[in-house]
A protein has these predicted regions:
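Ribokinase/PfkB-type carbohydrate-kinase core domain
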Residues: 1-8, 60-74, 88-224, 294-295
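Conserved phosphate-binding/catalytic region of the ribokinase-like
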Residues: 1-6, 191-295
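Substrate-binding N-lobe of the ribokinase-like
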Residues: 6-7, 18-83, 87-91, 98-102, ...
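A structural signal for the hydrophobic beta-strands that form the central parallel beta-sheet
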Residues: 9, 45, 123-124, 239
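Short polar catalytic/cofactor-binding loops
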Residues: 11-16
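Short, well-ordered alpha-helices that flank and scaffold nucleotide-derived cofactor binding pockets
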Residues: 34, 38, 60, 143, ...
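Hydrophobic pocket-lining residues within nucleotide cofactor-binding pockets
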Residues: 49, 127, 232
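Short secondary-structure capping/turn micro-motifs that flank functional sites
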Residues: 52-53, 78-79, 158, 183, ...
Length: 295
């Protein structure tokens, strides 16, 4: 797959609210779009924010990074997405709040923002389908776009239902998930389970992320596994999976071989683990990857 079209990103933009009140901008779709912008792919992010100061922060951050904000809708009632982070015995727990602005995507406005654009693929996660309004909007966008879909499975209790997630996978060409998610959906988290999952849902490729054990990609040519690079000083792993997804998309856009895509995605995800948070505003962070001819 080699194309000059733009990636279309649909999903949640939200703030992680830490126990000390600090807000960190994120959401998997925004994180992926953020990296794709740095890669020069000019993604269009379709999301929805609220009538609040947090929304102003979203617009400000995206505009400063040079991102197209024409797909960002502003709701008059529901707040900008928020996840409340608490610490229990030193371990973080996440309360993904209900009825946020991103749960109320306006399909008509989304399609209007796509007018005149050429889109190479559609990326979305599974959280955006937790409510009927945004789930319906996503379905209409898919129908309008008729482009291949990359679904990033993120099973966050209690915000997912087995049949709905399976339906989103079946409408995709590529799917990414972790070992626990594969076990929940397929009953097995091993290599045969990945291959069976790909065949069952007629996917071109399945990406299985395995934390410090690396990742694997299963496609029609078989399964390729790789461990992460050694000697990485991990600060936190927030956003590592989103970094992987972004490089996988970059590889699709430039028709990289599967082995190269896997190696580069792991390298970039490891680099993101050396910073605090899922994204970085220093373009020098991306320079070494550009110098290696990634884009």
């Amino acid at each position: 797959m080699t194309t000059s079209g733009r990636p279309l990103i649909v999903g949640e933009v939200l703030f992680d609210v830490m126990p000390d009140g600090i807000r960190v901008l994120g959401g998997a779709p925004l994180n992926v779009g953020w990296h794709l912008q740095a890669f020069g792919l000019r993604p269009l992010v379709i999301t929805r924010v609220g009538p609040d100061d947090a929304a102003d922060e979203v617009f400000g951050a995206m505009e400063e990074w040079g991102m197209d904000t024409s797909g960002v809708q502003r709701d008059e009632i529901y707040p900008t997405g928020r996840v409340q982070v608490e610490l229990q015995d030193g371990e973080p727990t996440f309360d993904i709040l209900a009825d946020q602005a991103y749960d109320h995507l306006d399909a008509r406005r989304a399609i209007h923002s796509m007018a005149g654009g050429t889109f190479s693929l559609l990326y979305h996660g599974s959280l955006i389908s937790r409510g009927d309004v945004s789930s319906s909007a996503l379905a209409r966008i898919k129908h309008q776009l008729d482009s291949p879909v990359f679904v990033d499975v993120n099973l966050r209790d209690p915000w997912w239902h087995h049949d709905e997630v399976v339906e989103s996978v079946q409408s995709a060409r590529w799917a990414k998930l972790n070992q626990r998610e594969l076990e929940l959906l397929a009953g097995s988290g091993d290599v045969p389970g990945v291959e069976g999952f790909r065949r069952e849902h007629d996917l071109e490729a399945v990406i299985l992320t395995r934390g410090d054990r690396g990742a694997l990609i299963a496609d029609s040519g078989g399964t390729i596994e790789k461990v992460p690079p050694e000697g990485v000083e991990v600060i936190d792993t927030v956003g590592a999976g989103d970094a992987f997804s972004a490089v996988f998309i970059l590889g699709l856009m430039h028709a990289w071989p599967t082995q190269q895509t896997l190696e580069r995605a792991l390298d970039f995800a490891a680099a993101v683990c050396t910073i605090t948070g899922a994204t970085v505003t220093d373009r020098a962070f991306y320079a070494k990857f550009a110098e290696q001819g990634w884009w």
